[in-house]
Amino acid sequence: MKTKFILLLMISAMCIWAGDRSPAPTTGAGSRAWTPRKTDRPVYSKLTFVPGFAGCSFYFPAADGKAIEVAFREAGRGEYKDVLTPSYNRREKLWRGSIVNLKENTSYEVKISSEGKVVAEGKFITKGALPKIAKTIVLSEKNFKDGTLTITAKGKPDGWIRYTCAPGFVLKNDRTKPLIVINKAKYIVLDKLVLNGGGHIAVEVNYASNIRITNCDLSGWGRPDAKQYFDYVLGGKPGYIDANGKQRSTNYSAGIALNYGDNILIEKCYIHDPAGHANSWRYSHPAGPCAIFAVCPTSTTVRYNDLVANDLGRWNDAVEGLYNFGEDGGFNRDAEIYGNFMIFCQDDNIELDGGQQNVRCFGNRFESSYCGVSIQGCMSGPCYVFGNMFISMGDQYGYHGQNIKTSTNGSGVDAVAYVLNNSFTGPGTGFSMNRLLKAVVMNNAYDTSYVSGAKVMKYQNSVSDYNVMPKVKEAVPGKNGKLVAPGYANAKQGVLEPKADSPLVKAGKVIPNFTPEKDVNIGAFQKGTILPLRPMPVKTSVNKLNFKVANKKSAPQSFKVKVCGKNYSSPFAVTKSATCDWFDVVPASGVFESGKEIEFTVTLKPELMDKKTVYRGAFLLRQPDGLSRPVSIYADTDFVQKARLHNDGNKTIYINAEDFISGDGKVEVINDKNADGGKAVRLYEAKKGGKPFVYEFTVPADGKYHLMLRSRSGHRPRVRVSMDGGKMYDSALALMNYWAWATAMDGSAKKTSNPWSWKVGYFTLKAGKHKLNIMPYGFKDIDLIALTSDPGPFEPR
């Protein structure tokens, strides 16, 4: 466990430079120039509220910095209830905090006390869901002719302008420009639009305010990736080569891009299947499409959306930000991100990096991503990550990092991150305390990952307590925490509610305004919780299904959906990507009705599953109003990737792992039908002072050759390598639990602080004979070694 943890931290550490240091896309066809602009930070001279739909930011200036207590109630109703203590910013002499778990379109009263006296009072009204529509514009082939709709219109607070489309009409273009551009418009609604295409971005929202994008279907934007070229080809500039031989950027290619602006809502949208795809950390920092791109907007709400890429066409981040280490970066301030489903990412499910000033991320389901929520670069704060579930983390190769990412030490002086009542299952390294970020980590449930970093908690008075996690040396559950299994109802199928006898039940700490007032469960699931958090009383009996395919056979599996509530009725339809043609779901449509239960059956199509070892997909039970319940599908097959992927000796030289000419380590022969030729060797690390395993090979031509080892998971996934008697360098191997090729970087390759310039290492070799030295850490199972000028085909399948 410790060694695996160290390796994952080594890979995770590569993430820390991604934010401000990552290049913005350049101008030109299919790109958008994001011009840096310092936003005007507000000055608060009195108690100020910035309401959202489900919460409200508050700001209270206090030059003396004396401690305060905050309480609220629904206007004129009941007793005041305490609010979690806000954080104090010494530079701005300002208290900042959030009130959560509020109702929409509801009036609330707040009072602030200090030293037993009320020092301020105020009122606010949360945002409501339905604006008044003054005008509706129906898009069709008659008025959408040029491939781009530019909106500059300005509605009014009591008269919004709504854009929708005629039945069956799909907004399309040739992918050289956006489908919709909203420039400095106000009071605009995009409702029930279907968009397929778009250039680098499908929908641009620039310096606009009071914009709502609701129940839209977006797919297919960006350049089709007929040929994707990664860092090792482009010399530090991830992207692809277009039909004219020009390099194009793939990063920041968004379904919806928010370029500054204020009071923007994105809800109930299905954003899926971009034309391009992101690379894995196997090559360099991931670069590629995202569903939503946030460039310093304020008062943004992203809720109830399904952001679903596909396993071979993954997001970089499902939700990405710019200026990750600027105090106005990313979602900037006063944002709510809740009730979303985000899946299939090469880096993060969501980047909150940047200002994170009263940014609230809660009630979401995060899945199948290298990292879950990134809060590195919390430059202003406070941010709140609470009540979320994390399942089946990992990129397309199964590599995984931190569930909640805190990699960098770049954080604001008085920034605070609250990580409360989240539930985690499956791979990942949990939460690492940070030397420069104060973190309050409480009431979280882990089954394989954990909170670590006890030695650095003291620097910012960080807190970890009332957490449940596995018993490992580095774990920091807290004084009132427990090192035990969480007792999830059915973690294998993603059901993270606690069992009746679970140590999570009624074992949590009461956190004012964030948890029930008594009987608090540790983790995301209190009584009656359904995630992702959505206003529909529909509950699936599982969140994911796991299949095995052998000899082109796999048994169907069923699950049930229960509809609770009273007088609830809505049609639904099974909705999934065209890339998920390898499974069927029945019934494909129907009606959800209160008090009724529906059984669904998922059947695989093994005849379409002969190209990968692992298949991953997802489908939605989606209603016409855009609300849905997601279910993910994972299938292990008996597919074995061909070992020798190049037959051209001028591109690749193969060496049988048993053909070393010398070496002091112990060797065992392994008979395995899935190894090359049915045989592999287990190479053991030599004793101190012992010599490495030495291999001789001949290179037919001068060139740059990447070292690849065909291996499988084993003890300590690292080796030391050298060429022709040079210095031995460490190389981390990203291994699978089956035979697959792993890149073994030349550790002598210089790394810059810019991860976009990192690339898969290589050796520059002259034609003729060479000697390769390999020393495993612990032991390694290896069947083949390759030196190749074209590593792309060696990707695990």
Model-derived regions: residue spans:
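Right-handed parallel beta-helix/beta-spiral solenoid domain characteristic of secreted/periplasmic
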Residues: 131-145, 151, 156-200, 212-247, ...
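Extracellular beta-strand/beta-solenoid scaffold signature
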Residues: 145-148, 174-180, 197-204, 227-258, ...
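Parallel beta-helix/beta-solenoid
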Residues: 153, 157-158, 166, 180, ...
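Predominantly extracellular beta-rich ligand-binding scaffolds that present long acidic/polar faces
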Residues: 360, 366, 383-495
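Extracytoplasmic
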Residues: 554, 576-586, 591-602, 610-625, ...
